[in-house]
Amino acid sequence: MNEMKMDRRVWLQKHILAMVYVMGALFGVMVIRYAWLQLVEGDALSERMRNQVGYDFAIQSPRGTITDRNGREMAVSLMTKSLYIDPNHVSDPDALATDLAPLINMPEQEILDDISAGGGFVWVKRRMEHDEYEAVRKMVREKSYTDCVGFRDEAKRYYPNDILGANVLGFVGTDDKGLDGIEQGLDGLLKGEVKEKYLTTDRQNRPILDSIFSSQRQYKGEYCKNVELTLDAGIQFIVEQELDRAMAENNPQAITCVVMNPKTGEVLAMASRPSYNPNSFYDYSPEVWKNRAVSFIYEPGSTFKSVVAAAALQEKVVSPNQVFVDPGYVMVSGRRIQNWSGTSFGTVTFTDVVKQSLNTGFAQVGLRLGAQKLTDYAKLFGFGTPTGIELPGEEGGLLFNPDDMRDSDVATMAIGQSIAVTPLQLVTAMSAIANDGVLLKPHIVKTITNVDGSIYEEKGTTEVRRTIESATDKTLVGLLEQVVASGGGKK
């Protein structure tokens, strides 16, 4: 009896020991497998899991706001919906295209082309209008397209004043990139940065437990800047009204106006006609996108005579009371140069030459200065090189090489021909005369601020150089005042 109990005890001990060995072996295998998965395949499996249940979404912080000098908003960013399709889950492409096309104003074939591209994601229409979004959302629910049609939130640039300041502001493309004007010139500051965020999605790749909208609403960007311009929207409005009136009354090909504070170099208004609405820039010819104040060069004509008079007075080749004989026209190197009236003014002083803008007198003054000095003074007043204003596409203008100039070139340059300038260059030069002969760098950006309101950069007055002596400038200003008081400018 005792032997049977002993045998049974030994048998149990052996089986228990065997089970312990087996369980220990299994546990060891599990530990080894766990270690293998963690240490060897862990990164790959983790990435596989992330790809199965979500994706990394790039969030672009909304562009900074652009305002005028008084805080009036001129360019802002609004949240909008963008439409996409998952071609892998489209069961009837023709039906979907037929239903979508009239709601988003797109040809059915274009939508079919998007679907045929395949894959799990394709944009159909970016940054829809609100009524478009509401119409599509309703249709998607009613016709059960939720498996293949979805929306994502994106920022859309909006210009609340429509055409006002359009050629200065520019516009933004589909991918939030500035394509003209300040939007392009300061794109790196306005655009801010892109931030990656992981979103958990459902089987149709739609975000769950979070949304792109809430992510973008919370994420304001750490580096995008707001820009305050030197423009005064009130002055800008008056200028553009007058340009529209001039276009209607005179029917010119184009017209440009620049208003500048000569004591600071701040541009208070800058406008061109024809122009466009940056909210729908794609409806206009690219030619009207250009800011003619900085990108268009032309012969300045009699307006350049102020610079010639400044040079002549500074170099003392003339004095206000010096006498000239005006025959009505002069011949220079075989070229006839005559007065605007086509008549002779007889014996006149240099003051009269300036007051009446006599081409014959200025041609003689130009020849007295000579090609080198005439060109040197043009450069002193900023002609021949870009001003450096914060706008893209600025032209530098055209100046003759003095060594290549004939007498006729010198004479015609003295009356504002044989030279090409931008409207901004001309206004900058005239502002120097109004500023005691000191040339300032024009600027259209007043302040750049961070998202928290702190100052990132504050623009101020930048003195470039003195063009003529103060005494000379005072004499010149006295002559120019007579032009508008009793001379040719009175008209």
What is each of the regions a protein language model found here?
Residues 1-281, 372-384, 488:
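Periplasmic/cell-envelope proteins involved in peptidoglycan metabolism and beta-lactam response
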Residues 3, 75, 202-218, 255-302, ...:
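Beta-lactam-recognizing serine transpeptidase/beta-lactamase-like catalytic domain environment
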